[in-house]
Every structure is written in structure tokens, then in C-alpha cells.
């Protein structure tokens, strides 16, 4: 089965450019604003949307994304409302892939079978569940595959040759290479090392490789784009939204404009990089 993710990356490969994958937190700072951000992302240049599922104990996330999740939870965001966001987005956009990203606990509480049914009905194309290793594929990965939803794995600089085949087994959609160890929003990675890592992973898979963690500026995104099939930006977008909120996390400025202006700049930079490389 071909998903929107497969189709999108095939289109981009034909165009000779990498994807811009944009992450933001579902329900941050509130449901209405977050949905406006989501709907505005493709026009700003996002090729794939990662929709964060807020969770109270996000161990892999840095302070910015933790704060975004807390704002969303405080505003009443639930997994059902995050699925609602996907469904509402799909009423206007049937081509941009949606990948829900987060932790297993909210899905487990919601009910795996129910979640996959509702996710598919809402137009969700892929899942990234950061705390479910390949040894637990039977929990969610294999059921997701059967439901026609891509299950996207994370690889890191410490994923060795013995571990890599296990990580890639049952992976689909794309591979998310975490360009450094630690939490999201940390310092930028060494782009030469990223290039080496991507080439190494590609020896073991035909899936597109997207690189994230630590990409904050258009310049950094462009540097990563020369090595990868996609660049993932999350913390910078979350920070752009947060910069338009008051100390209580309520909207005081224009978070939609702040997010889309950044994404537009990132998209221009990413697209130009590959075009230059191809000339």
C-alpha cells in the first residue's frame, strides 16, 4: 500500500530536492490556534507535518517542547482532540502527509485498536513513537502496518551495525536520523558527520532519511539538506509560537504568522540548497 508519505517523497525525489518536515505541538497554545498553524504550514513550504501528541512526561524532549506540551495539556488538549486536528486539516488538504509523534502511554490509554482506527479515519499517515523500541513491534508497529499507517523509526549516532537492522526492520515511510544524542533543541550537529551517517544508513535501507534534532535556522537546515532526503525542524517552530504568547501561555501576538514566516524561510533555504547542489 502506498501512503501519502511514499507519494510525497517520490515526488520530491523526482524534483531533486529534500523535504522540509515541520514539527509542532498539537493544541499549543490552544486547539484553535494550533489548528490554524497546522493549516498554514503547507502554504508556507512544509512538505510533511509532524503533529506532536502532548504527554506529561516527555523524556526525549527539551525544555521548549516540554513547555509546549504542558501549555497544550493545560488548555485541555487530549489525544482525541489531536486526532480531530488531523481530521479538520484533511478537509482542506488531502496530500500533505501527517505524522503523529509522541509517546506510547497516551495511545495505550486510548486503546491501540481504537487509536489506529481513528487515526486512519482522520487521515494520519505515519507514527513516530519515541519510547517503543523494535523489540515491542507487536504492541503498535505491526498493528499500524496492518492498518496502512507508516511506522517511522529513530536512529542515532550510537545505533551500531548490530542494532541498525533491528531498528530498520518493519520501518516504513522514512527513517528519522537523530543527528545527536540528547534532547530535542540541543546544539547543531556536525554536518560532515551527518553526511557520513546518512550514507551509512542508506546502505541498509531504500527508505528516505530525514535528519532532525538541533536544526534551528535556515542556514543550518540548508547545511543538513545537502546530505539528507529531508530536514526536520521542531524546536525552532515551537519557539516561534511561544514568542507570541504571554507569560501565562495565552496568545498576545500572532503565533500563526511567526510560525509560517520561519517555515517559509526554512523552505526557501532547503529548496535552494539541493538546486545548487544539482547544478
Curated annotation (Swiss-Prot):
It holds the Pfam family Trp_syntA. One of its GO terms (molecular function) is tryptophan synthase activity. Pathway: Amino-acid biosynthesis; L-tryptophan biosynthesis; L-tryptophan from chorismate: step 5/5. It comes from Brucella suis (strain ATCC 23445 / NCTC 10510). This is Tryptophan synthase alpha chain. It catalyses: (1S,2R)-1-C-(indol-3-yl)glycerol 3-phosphate + L-serine = D-glyceraldehyde 3-phosphate + L-tryptophan + H2O. PANTHER family: TRYPTOPHAN SYNTHASE ALPHA CHAIN, CHLOROPLASTIC (PTHR43406:SF1), TRYPTOPHAN SYNTHASE, ALPHA CHAIN (PTHR43406). HAMAP family: Trp_synth_alpha (MF_00131). Belongs to the TrpA family. Its EC number is 4.2.1.20. InterPro entries: Aldolase_TIM, RibuloseP-bd_barrel, Trp_synthase_alpha_AS, Trp_synthase_suA. Keywords: Amino-acid biosynthesis, Aromatic amino acid biosynthesis, Lyase, Tryptophan biosynthesis. The active site is at 50 (proton acceptor), 61 (proton acceptor). One of its GO terms (cellular component) is cytosol. SUPFAM superfamilies: Ribulose-phoshate binding barrel. Signal peptide: none annotated. The lineage of its organism: Bacteria, Pseudomonadati, Pseudomonadota, Alphaproteobacteria, Hyphomicrobiales. The alpha subunit is responsible for the aldol cleavage of indoleglycerol phosphate to indole and glyceraldehyde 3-phosphate. Tetramer of two alpha and two beta chains.
Amino acid at each position: 500500500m502506498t501512503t501519502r508519505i511514499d507519494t510525497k517523497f517520490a515526488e520530491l525525489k523526482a524534483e531533486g530536492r529534500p523535504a522540509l518536515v515541520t514539527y509542532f505541538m498539537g493544541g499549543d497554545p490552544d486547539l484553535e490556534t494550533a489548528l490554524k498553524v497546522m493549516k498554514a504550514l503547507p502554504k508556507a513550504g512544509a512538505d510533511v507535518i509532524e503533529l506532536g501528541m502532548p504527554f506529561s512526561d516527555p523524556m526525549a524532549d527539551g525544555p521548549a517542547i516540554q513547555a509546549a506540551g504542558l501549555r497544550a495539556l493545560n488548555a485541555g488538549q487530549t489525544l482525541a482532540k489531536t486526532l480531530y486536528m488531523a481530521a479538520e486539516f484533511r478537509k482542506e488538504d488531502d496530500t500533505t502527509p501527517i505524522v503523529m509523534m509522541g509517546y506510547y502511554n497516551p495511545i495505550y490509554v486510548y486503546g491501540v485498536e481504537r487509536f489506529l482506527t481513528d487515526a486512519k479515519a482522520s487521515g494520519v499517515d505515519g507514527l513516530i513513537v519515541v519510547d517503543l523500541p523494535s523489540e515491542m513491534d507487536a504492541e503498535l508497529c505491526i498493528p499500524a502496518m496492518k492498518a496502512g499507517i507508516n511506522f517511522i523509526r529513530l536512529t542515532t549516532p550510537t545505533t551500531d551495525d548490530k542494532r541498525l537492522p533491528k531498528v530498520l526492520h518493519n520501518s516504513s515511510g522514512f527513517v528519522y536520523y537523530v543527528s545527536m544524542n540528547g534532547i530535542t533543541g540541543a546544539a547543531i550537529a556536525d554536518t560532515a558527520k551527518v553526511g557520513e551517517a546518512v550514507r551509512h544508513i542508506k546502505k541498509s535501507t531504500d527508505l528516505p532519511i530525514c535528519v532532525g534534532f538541533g536544526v534551528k535556522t535556515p542556514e543550518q537546515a540548508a547545511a543538513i539538506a545537502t546530505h539528507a532526503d529531508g530536514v526536520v525542524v521542531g524546536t525552532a517552530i515551537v519557539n516561534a509560537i511561544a514568542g507570541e504568547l504571554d507569560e501565562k501561555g495565552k496568545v498576545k501576538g500572532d503565533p500563526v504568522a511567526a510560525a509560517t514566516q520561519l517555515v517559509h524561510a526554512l523552505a526557501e533555504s532547503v529548496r535552494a540548497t539541493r538546486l545548487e547542489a544539482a547544478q
